[in-house]
């Protein structure tokens, strides 16, 4: 059995199929972990949702910011972005089934040796806090209050974690950390604006969330996507897998057992 983790697909279905074919992926013996943003600007978001859903227990998925946006659009709470190629999802006969399945996916998935989320884990959280925060918001996403949360989650504030946060402030921070975070200010506040590669950031105010000096160390490796400008990032405890396939880059997948990387250049 092999465990494969893949970065942001964003509807780049054909590239995903090429990667899985290359490693002879077997639903009977292997597992595919997907680091969020299954849908958005790529040409085959509908096919991607259907395929990943069809994998059943052979797939582990976490929600990304584009996945949450798709759910918000489905409730009429947000407009579809011009660059998103998600209209076929809303025209599909199985749209309700697909969207219901998507809403049941977690913000944080855990393996014996690693955890996976879309953007990262707040530098102020230890692993147990991250688990608890994820479960708090997942209960809402998977319940009757989902439309309320989707309507009210869009905000860059609060930008600093405090365990005394309550209600929407607490949920917004948790969602932003798991699905939108890239840089932090030196005091730990989240920056929601800068998308540059770290080497292009001048000054010492902005630091990648995983390089913040006072970040709480985690006992497991964190695998994440979201940050295409990193073009992949690997160290002992952090692995970034988004290499911008939807932007003309590549789709990257890692086999956990031997840490071998597999890449597929964008086909379109």
Swiss-Prot record:
Q: Quick one: which gene encodes this?
A: apaH
**Functional note:** Hydrolyzes diadenosine 5',5'''-P1,P4-tetraphosphate to yield ADP.
Checking CDD domains in the record gives:
MPP_ApaH (cd07422)
The enzyme's first-digit EC class, named in words, is: hydrolase
User: Would you tell me the protein name for this molecule?
Assistant: Bis(5'-nucleosyl)-tetraphosphatase, symmetrical
User: Keywords in UniProt for this one?
Assistant: Hydrolase
| Pfam families reported for this sequence | Metallophos (PF00149)
Coiled coil ranges (UniProt) are none
Work out whether the entry's keyword set contains Hydrolase. Answer: yes
Entry EC number(s): 3.6.1.41
Q: Which InterPro entries match?
A: ApaH (IPR004617), Calcineurin-like_PHP_ApaH (IPR004843), Metallo-depent_PP-like (IPR029052)
Family, per the entry? Answer: Belongs to the Ap4A hydrolase family.
Which molecular function terms from Gene Ontology are attached? Answer: bis(5'-nucleosyl)-tetraphosphatase (symmetrical) activity
Organism classification, top ranks? Answer: Bacteria, Pseudomonadati, Pseudomonadota, Gammaproteobacteria, Vibrionales
Q: Which reaction does it catalyse?
A: P(1),P(4)-bis(5'-adenosyl) tetraphosphate + H2O = 2 ADP + 2 H(+)
């Amino acid at each position: 059995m092999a465990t494969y983790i893949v970065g942001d697909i964003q509807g780049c279905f054909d590239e995903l199929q090429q990667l899985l074919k290359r490693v002879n992926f077997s639903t009977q013996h292997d597992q595919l972990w997907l680091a969020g943003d299954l849908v958005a600007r790529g040409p085959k978001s509908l096919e991607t949702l259907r395929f990943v859903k069809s994998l059943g227990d052979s797939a582990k998925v976490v929600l990304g910011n584009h996945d949450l946006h798709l759910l918000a659009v489905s409730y009429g709470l947000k407009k579809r972005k011009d660059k998103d190629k998600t209209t076929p999802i809303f025209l599909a006969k199985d749209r309700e089934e697909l969207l219901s399945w998507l809403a049941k996916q977690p913000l944080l998935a855990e393996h014996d040796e690693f955890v996976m989320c879309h953007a990262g884990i707040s530098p102020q959280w230890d692993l147990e806090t991250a688990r608890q925060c994820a479960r708090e918001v997942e209960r809402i996403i998977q319940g009757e209050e989902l439309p309320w949360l989707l309507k009210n989650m869009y905000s860059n504030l609060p930008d600093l974690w405090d365990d005394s946060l309550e209600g929407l402030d607490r949920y917004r921070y948790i969602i932003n950390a798991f699905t939108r975070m890239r840089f932090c200010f030196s005091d730990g506040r989240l920056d929601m604006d800068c998308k540059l590669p770290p080497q292009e950031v001048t000054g010492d105010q902005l630091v990648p969330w995983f390089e913040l000096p006072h970040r709480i160390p985690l006992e497991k490796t964190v695998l994440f996507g979201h940050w295409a400008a990193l073009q992949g990032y690997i160290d002992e405890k952090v692995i970034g897998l988004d290499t911008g396939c939807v932007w003309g880059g590549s789709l990257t997948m890692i086999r956990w057992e031997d840490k071998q990387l597999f890449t597929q250049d964008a086909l379109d």
